[in-house]
Amino acid sequence: LASSAASDVYKRQILYRPTRGMVSDHFNTDKKHFGTDIAANPNESVLATMDGTVFLSTYTAETGYVIGVQHSQDFVSIYKHCGSLLKKEGDRVKGGEAIALVGNSGTLSTGPHLHFELWYKGHPVNPEKYIVF
């Protein structure tokens, strides 16, 4: 349901691929994997997928350096396991703007990659339905 509504809204948006690399793990709610993993070179730029405001820029033991961006139309994007963060909470960002660098941070990381999540109205949606990786 959320995915269908998200699709309708997203058709009117310009989305940027969050980093260069290859998909190494897919969105799978059954496995509680609420994002797409993109294997990438360390220090590759992580880009905001759309315009928005950074609401989270922090470090956690499990997910390492994490940045979250609130977008219009009730969308949120989350970027985990970064090597470093380039923006702080409250910063306005443009779609395609570098917000972090790819890394291997956090105990759940298995190598240099970006774990990218997309949420619509509080529900995870499959990023691969909206962005060509």
Regions found by a protein language model. Give the residues of each.
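Conserved strand-loop elements at the edges of beta-sheets that form or border functional pockets
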Residues: 3, 17, 40, 48, ...
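Conserved, short, structured surface segments that act as functional micro-motifs
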Residues: 91-133
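Single conserved hydrophobic/aromatic residue that forms the stacking wall/gate
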Residues: 1-6, 10
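Zn2+-dependent peptidoglycan hydrolase active-site motif and core
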Residues: 49-86, 112-113
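Residue-level recognition of beta-strand microenvironments
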Residues: 26, 57-58, 85, 102-105
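Soluble periplasmic/extracytoplasmic beta-strand elements of cell-envelope proteins
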Residues: 16, 22-24, 35-37, 66-68, ...
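Short glycine/threonine/proline-enriched tight-turn/helix- or strand-capping micro-motif at secondary-structure
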Residues: 20-48
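Short, well-structured beta-strand-loop connectors
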Residues: 45-54, 87-102
